[in-house]
Amino acid sequence: VHDRAASTFQISSAQACVRQVQRLLQRIERRFAMRQIELDVGGEIVPFYRVADPDKVLDDVAREADLRQRLDGRRCADEPVHLPYWAEFWESGAALVAALAEGSIVENAPGLSVLDLGCGMGTAGAGAIVLGHRVMLADVVADALLFAQLNGVLAAKHTGQAPTARTRRVNWCTDCLSERFDLILGADVLYDKTQWAALERFWLAHLAPGGVVLLAEPGRQSGDVFIDWLSGRPWSLQIDKQRIPGREQPIRLLRLKTA
């Protein structure tokens, strides 16, 4: 009886996953051209959907902002335009996945509570789901969360988990969540130094005791300046490099723990 019940759950769970994937694909296809690629999670190959033409998304956002400005006469300062950086498949996200799978930077004990902050299409978060962690995918842009939810569901399906993916619209400058996390991930979130103080406040407010912030960035000058900025602040910093296929230069990893 127990085996039959488990089998029934697996079938119904798989069917629910297929339906959810179909619904999300239909919603996304109404607005975006997309293509499926493969996400390598420590040798596990998982389907992953990304925007087919990120430049077109950028053009569309700029055109909509220009239209609003012409209609209103001005653009309201309290309604900032969020440039669609989320629509790019950033290699830093793949580097976080590789680092998590290898377990060399953060111990890969399944079941960690993980926040993929500024998740974009959900690369790092999807990888963490495949590795057995409890993941929230968070971004300020609603369109990004459609892709993140789809990719999170596909990652959960790959592991046989329930066909759900926790997504949350989060502005790290203003929002406060009701939970803390063992691990906060950030791929290419250091490009704007005016955001660093807000990011730090958010990390400190949402890290569980002993928790880790793991950041990935491709070695930009902004990353160098950020490392200098951290000096004298309440963090211990470990710097590592992560190689990924198809990229000559490694991605820089920054592992932060409260000092």
Feature map (PLM): residue ranges:
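S-adenosylmethionine-dependent methyltransferases
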Residues: 2-259
